Amino acid sequence: MRTSQYLLATQKETPADAVVISHQLMLRAGMIRKLASGLYTWLPMGLRVMRKVEAVVREEMNAAGALEVLMPSIQPAELWQESGRWEQYGPELLRLKDRHQRDFCVGPTHEEVITDLARNELSSYKQLPLNMYQIQTKFRDEIRPRFGLMRGREFIMKDAYSFHADQASLQETYDRMHQAYSNVFTRLGLDFRPVQADTGSIGGSYSHEFHVLAESGEDDVIFSDSSDYAANIEKAEAIPRETVRPAPTEELRLVDTPDAKTIAQLVENHGLAIEKTVKTLIVRGAEEGKLVALVVRGDHELNEIKAAKLEQVADPLIMATDAELREAIGAGAGSLGPLNLPLEVVIDRSVALMSDFGIGANIDDKHYFGVNWERDLPVPQVADLRNVVEGDPSPDGQGTLVIKRGIEVGHIFQLGTKYSEALKCQVLGENGKPVVLSMGCYGIGVSRVVAAAIEQSYDDKGIIWNDALAPFQIALVPLRYETDVVREATDKLYAELTAAGFEVLLDDRDKKTSPGIKFADMELIGIPHRIVVSDRGLADGNLEYKHRTEQDAQALPLNEVLTFLQARVRR
């Protein structure tokens, strides 16, 4: 491809509303353009990259036995009402009416549609297992679209759905898809981690997320430094570093603390070590009108997903209001503690191993210091309530936990029978009796992968693409292309490289565009291999080669260029 025949839409300045590096560089490199909040047009340069992601995804899905389909993006409300999600989904579900006043939505996901297809097409266990996928535009009406493609409203997604007569078959396909996802991200050259995850609003019983590691990531990715254990922050089990509760050394005492409304003030003004403090958080119970106290160490954070899974706690988690606290306890949030508390109490594992610690006295501006379990108050229910922190023991007993930032680019679920029961999707089993189908679902954010790859690989000059993702593998940059000798050599090399199967962008802009601008544009776009043709080099029988990640260029004999690139460029 020649730049004279291409939309080379690079920009020197960074748009003011672009915050994250992928958004900045995709705009500057001429990959995308903003149409409206959370909506982007893919320009030719960006679309070439996304098509490469799609191709790898499609190859691995096909190799895993999945069949490609294409479902409508507009879905009838009846299906969502049948599954119960029409009422459950919030305003991120874009709802509309047609001219006949029938309700529809723009699909954020396709569980209902695929289950409707399966119940109409499948009748016997002999047709199973069946795994179908699509690469389709999705829409979620995010309240605050931001970060470019990282959190837009419209996006491209690969979503697959599998149907099974039993759990063993589902597990087999789930494992195959897990491997297929690992293959996809490995082939794309990404540093990623698959992690155990909570099933969230999709539902189901078992899931894994796939995260591209990047400092700009929104999610914490937890993994062991000595094993393959990995989980997201919602799912990671918190194991206390302590194994035995120390014996008491202090007496219980009631202390005036008008200057300690927070843990930080308690530590600063009263000399307590933060690991000797606790936070008592009051939440609404599963039973109407009931409150429950959750207690974590002062330096730990409550994990709301874990807490909401307690049978006595309302799901989703709802914190008690100040009025509810006053009515039930008679004190404000900064003075609460588990001693003499007229509520059911659940404490974190780490709290159960504390001694000589400080708690709120359930009286405004007062705390108890020197508190000890069993001596001063009984040990209540103990549960895993907190987020893990770096250095915690790995739950599998091997090594300690490391925390990195990650960008979620894939998610796989074992849905079980959640949707098939709701939509009555069943077949005749081997014994001739109806069997409700078990389902799996498997998503990859195709457009998000492009942005995540940039977040993982860039420098102050621009994007650094690997060979698998680059829009073009080779940038061919002639200096003084208007001269016969340079033009003839360049055109001949361009023909040879394209005939050999390389993806080449020939920068044939005229002499009004300086070599410096040409080099800067190619580095901004991130093309991994650059060949410079100049009259001076040709006089010596050489071209100039430079890889995007290298500082210095090297001379390359003209008659060795093809062999060199065939060995260097990964295809």
Swiss-Prot record:
Primary location class: cytoplasm
Presence of the UniProt keyword tRNA processing in the record: no
Transmembrane intervals: none
Gene: proS
Subunit structure: Homodimer.
InterPro entries xrefs: aa-tRNA-synt_IIb, aa-tRNA-synth_II, aa-tRNA-synth_II/BPL/LPL, Anticodon-bd, Anticodon-bd_dom_sf, Pro-tRNA-ligase_IIa, Pro-tRNA-synth_IIa_bac-type, Pro-tRNA-Synthase_IIa_type1
Top-rank lineage group of the source organism: Bacteria
GO cellular component: cytosol
Keyword ATP-binding on entry: yes
This protein's UniProt keywords: Aminoacyl-tRNA synthetase, ATP-binding, Cytoplasm, Ligase, Nucleotide-binding, Protein biosynthesis
GO BP term, example: prolyl-tRNA aminoacylation
Subcellular location: Cytoplasm
Family (UniProt): Belongs to the class-II aminoacyl-tRNA synthetase family. ProS type 1 subfamily.
Pfam (any one): HGTP_anticodon
Entry EC number(s): 6.1.1.15
Role noted for this protein: Catalyzes the attachment of proline to tRNA(Pro) in a two-step reaction: proline is first activated by ATP to form Pro-AMP and then transferred to the acceptor end of tRNA(Pro). As ProRS can inadvertently accommodate and process non-cognate amino acids such as alanine and cysteine, to avoid such errors it has two additional distinct editing activities against alanine. One activity is designated as 'pretransfer' editing and involves the tRNA(Pro)-independent hydrolysis of activated Ala-AMP.
Protein name per UniProt: Proline--tRNA ligase
GO molecular function terms listed in the Swiss-Prot or TrEMBL record: aminoacyl-tRNA deacylase activity; ATP binding; proline-tRNA ligase activity
CDD domains: ProRS-INS, ProRS_anticodon_short, ProRS_core_prok
Reaction(s) catalysed by this chain's protein: tRNA(Pro) + L-proline + ATP = L-prolyl-tRNA(Pro) + AMP + diphosphate
Domain commentary: Consists of three domains: the N-terminal catalytic domain, the editing domain and the C-terminal anticodon-binding domain.
